[in-house]
Amino acid sequence: MTKITRDKRNFKFETLQLHVGQEQADPTTDARAVPIYQTSSYVFRNCDHAAARFGLSDAGNIYGRLTNPTEDVFEKRIAALEGGVAALAVASGAAAVTYTILNLAQNGDNIVSAKNIYGGSFNLFEHTLPQYGIDTNFVDIFNEEQVESAINEKTKALYIETLGNPNSDVVDIESVAKIAHKHKIPLVVDNTFATPYLVRPIEYGADIVVHSATKFIGGHGTSIGGVIVDGGNFDWEASGKFDSLTKPNPSYHGISFTQACGAAAFVTKVRAILLRDTGATVSPFNAFLFLQGLETLSLRVERHSYNALKVVEYLNNHPQVESVSHPSVSTDPKQQELYKKYFPNGGGSIFTFDIKVDAQKAKDFIDNLELFSLLANVADVKSLVIHPATTTHSQCTEEELLDQGIRPNTIRLSIGCENIDDIIQDLDEAFKAIA
């Protein structure tokens, strides 16, 4: 009987999250765990070797701002889990989003974005990027006609989140991808809230996937980081809209990234140009912690999802709750359909609900929670809570808040991995305290 070699096996997600990037023990020390390479720089064998590294003709480490062996394992692992060809780890999720847009658009260009997105991304698109000549057309992502009409000859990307923040609206990735590709632009998907364990956007037509690794990937609220995953399927040359990728780049020896780097052209350019010039590098120690998080990602997400569905059911039947914004209890037939399509095993442990009180009482409810932590993060193993209108989305105007489904009595929950009875009891006590 012929033995199937390791590199030819079609390993499942749970196996990939443990092994990709370090299939064997460390060759120098025989350590099974991925070492932390806490170094700023690397020795070249000779001047020719150094020149080859800087010219990208020899793949390998140049300087700690650009590459690191610990980070390399993390990048390979997340790329495999998302089904991409390559990935780049950076210092934060915000850096991942910023680099992605700056790698696509320049002064005079625009992107089209769903309006129901993370408040930090909204502010980046609405206020910061316009200072550099990059505008954003915000749309109702569920209105295909509106999306189509927002795209023009200067549009360089369509941007969505798998699950809208903070209300967990499920976006039809496949449908939006078709619109993007019809106009020869890439679809960028922030998959932070879903994780590749629940949804792999590249399989539905996404071209670039970004994450805040701080959230589910790390999972324990200890580290800040982000990831950009290159799907490797977008034809940059056929598009004709991305000269910085296809034509000789004057800031890097005149190379064409599509010619030199093939399917991984996009993420290679981010590393070689943007990371080189602006330096939002993830630390080796944080990359190590993210690898630790990845090893239990599937287990944690299963528990998060189970607990979340129980909490949603509890809130949806509570007399003091006005509404729950979670696709599992949505009355919108389209949302029900999309939830079944993209989340057949459930999911969505970050969501909002509107309590039947005014803003002050909503804040009183939050202040009476004891198990939930009031902080500006999500997807921790511990349950978290926040008042979006006065925190994460406080920079938005009243109209922008309403557009994103955020009202003064809206509360966002991030359901953790505690015992479900304890989670519900904590919520119950807070409701009693404001009754």
Language-model features, listed with the residues they occupy:
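N-terminal "arm"/small-domain region of PLP-dependent enzymes with the aminotransferase-like
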Residues: T2-N68, K76-R77
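Conserved PLP-enzyme active-site core in the AAT-like
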Residues: T2-R9, Q17, G21-A25, A87-N317
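Active-site beta-loop-alpha junctions enriched in small/polar residues
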Residues: L163, T192-A194, V329, K356, ...
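Conserved C-terminal alpha-helix-loop-beta "cap" of PLP-dependent enzymes
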Residues: V301, L309, N316, Q320-I411, ...
